[in-house]
Amino acid sequence: GETTSWSDPIVTDLRDLSKVRFDPQNEYFQGILNLTETALRHAEGEFIVGYTDLHPGVDCAAALRGSTNLCMDFYDDPEGIPPLLDAAVRDFEWIFNRFHELLKEHGQPSVSWMHVPSFETMHIPSADFSSLISSDLFNEYCLPIHLRETALATHNVYHVDGPDVARHLDSILEMNSVNPIQLVHGEDYGNRSRQGRNLRRHRQDAGTSVIVDLHKDDLAEFMKVMDPRGLFLWIATESEEEEHEIIRSLEQWARSSSS
């Protein structure tokens, strides 16, 4: 798709990671920095600029190795995976701080694509690749990396990309460094599904704040089964009139729930 990123794997042998190194002068990193700086120069007093989407850890490792190859590595060479994961998170602190400092120099909050700003530091951890592995493998290989990356930010909103990632939620929520979670439905997991509503309700009952990407046609049914406390809804609309109508519905929902 046009709104995602693609990569060509470069690691053909887990025992040779010589190609895995970060060059701050590479054209892609410099290009993103230049775009960010240009936006910041035009943003003063007008709008907020976020830093680019960052994917350290297992998703970076999957890009370097290839998802299929990495899946097979868990069977064929599990001892070779930790060095690759370490290489995939090694430079994250420097990169994260570089963007954070750039935003602060221009008086901007710390914010990225999720539009959740922080006056301190904000990060969106994720592990989309974890949809392909078991919870045991997630706990062994992914959690330690998550703990390293989330320790850098004051606020961490975990991006749960679909039901196959959501099966790791209990482990994700054990991390004290993760604040709310953002639940995304898959193509076969729509907001209309009972499974999706039950999952959100289960997380809310556990006291976890939840960001929900919700279709406007699902709002009425959603409000019947959910408590509004701790929710942040993303709802796309077609017009300003529709937006006001949705706001009125949400206000009524909040009043009825608090009474």
Predicted regions, residues:
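A contiguous, low-structure linker/loop signature
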Residues: 1-16
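Active-site loop segments of alpha/beta catalytic cores
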Residues: 1-3, 22-259
